[in-house]
Amino acid sequence: MIEFGNFYQLIAKNHLSHWLETLPAQIAAWQREQQHGLFKQWSNAVEFLPEMTPWRLDLLHSVTAESETPLSEGQLKRIDTLLRNLMPWRKGPFSLYGVDIDTEWRSDWKWDRVLPHLSELTGRTILDVGCGSGYHLWRMIGAGAHLAVGIDPTQLFLCQFEAVRKLLGNDQRAHLLPLGIEQLPALKAFDTVFSMGVLYHRRSPLEHLWQLKDQLVNEGELVLETLVIDGDENTVLVPGDRYAQMRNVYFIPSAPALKKWLEKCGFIDVRIADVCVTTTEEQRRTEWMVTESLADFLDPNDRSKTVEGYPAPQRAVLIARKP
């Protein structure tokens, strides 16, 4: 059974305490609702994992936990089997006592692109919207964050996060809540808010930017990473039925257009920190994610286009500040 009591106790003593006016009731409602058909199987995998305390823990350069002496073949097999019950693993990688989870995405590459452009994270309270398995939450802690809170309604991601947390010694500096951004009140409590890989899935992208702004303290920093296309400040792609085989892609702006959107929503000091094409080395099929990946979504005769004929995925990082 995945519980959230530790998080409630934690925020009861800090500047997030007003969240307790709504959060426990929301989580209780989530627990009462019909869960995914495999949720019991996933939560059992977490429950059956051994409690581990790392002898060496590296969250600064990777997400790596090691024991003082190598685990037995039986212990490794148990951990490996239980973690494979939580496939597909999309965001990572993780190295846990000799079990290496080679995820679909090299999320460490994204972190390496983003980190140099951020304000110092030491001591900060952070929100990561659409955090997936929580890989970047651990990297935020490694970079010095005081508390990293992720939200993502996908139940498999919650179980993946709790599995990793259990193998990291039940670390309480990072937490994942099974909520969407629309379920959060205007907390105005986070020093840094991340939204990475979310904006193009939103029917109303400007509303999403306002929601992110409502979570920030004054002078807080927004880190926005999303799909973009080439063009000027008036260029926006509105795909048809699918983009790179994804049905729920609504708006893909150019980076200059996205900068203009952020300014329209009242953000200041907006800058385009990075733009790069997504490669099949960064997003690919692995033994931990065995279904289709980026290579299957690109035109086999022209890798600069998706199978639908749109420009192939490229992603931008924009940094902005709430006044």
Swiss-Prot record:
It catalyses: carboxy-S-adenosyl-L-methionine + 5-hydroxyuridine(34) in tRNA = 5-carboxymethoxyuridine(34) in tRNA + S-adenosyl-L-homocysteine + H(+). It comes from the Bacteria. InterPro entries: CmoB (IPR010017), Mo5U34_MeTrfas-like (IPR027555), SAM-dependent_MTases_sf (IPR029063). SUPFAM superfamilies: S-adenosyl-L-methionine-dependent methyltransferases (SSF53335). GO terms for molecular function: methyltransferase activity; transferase activity, transferring alkyl or aryl (other than methyl) groups. It holds the Pfam family Methyltransf_9. It is an enzyme of class 2 (transferase). Its EC number is 2.5.1.-. Keywords: Transferase, tRNA processing. Carboxy-S-adenosyl-L-methionine binds at K91, W105, K110, G130, D152, P153, T154, I181, E182, M196, Y200, R315. CDD domains: AdoMet_MTases. GO terms for biological process: tRNA wobble uridine modification. HAMAP family: tRNA_carboxymethyltr_CmoB. Catalyzes carboxymethyl transfer from carboxy-S-adenosyl-L-methionine (Cx-SAM) to 5-hydroxyuridine (ho5U) to form 5-carboxymethoxyuridine (cmo5U) at position 34 in tRNAs. Homotetramer. Belongs to the class I-like SAM-binding methyltransferase superfamily. CmoB family. This is tRNA U34 carboxymethyltransferase.
